[in-house]
Amino acid sequence: MKDLTMLLHELKDMSFFNKGDICLIGCSTSEVIGEKIGTVGSMEVAETIFNALDVVSKETGVTFAFQGCEHINRAITIEKSQFNPLTMEEVSVVPDVHAGGSLATYAFQHMKDPIVVEHITVPCGIDIGQTLIGMHIKHVCVPVRTSVKQVGQAIVTIATSRPKKIGGERAKYQ
């Protein structure tokens, strides 16, 4: 997927991926192939995307988490090594193509030691196909603009975050 490669290259060039961070991926493989979200799904597309992200992870040190679909309440598949019991709650579900989505399913099948958590708060994410990842991005969510607007036929939205500005009119900010 040329557009995915271009997107990831552009994000690497702008230092979007940081070593030690978790980046959330939401993806509708149905949308990537031009169908309505949640209707078709493609393990082949999921494999392509997962493998491209795995390369980025090895190059940058970022870890990826994978959001499931609404049928599993947008639960997140992560490596167990990233699990923090103080901020995350493990749930008993295994993503499936028809309940979780193809990419979360593929990730669960190919990660070293995957678990699924109900919620996560991460500093950044990539939403391929309008899967609504914002619920898992740290406050304050900030859009990131790139030249790549779609992966396949799916609209791409990228987000990072910044600390909240609090304190009112007398507060000073960096």
UniProtKB/Swiss-Prot annotation:
This is UPF0340 protein SAR2202. InterPro entries: Antibiotic_NAT-like (IPR028345), DUF436 (IPR006340). It comes from the Bacteria. Belongs to the UPF0340 family. It comes from Staphylococcus aureus (strain MRSA252).
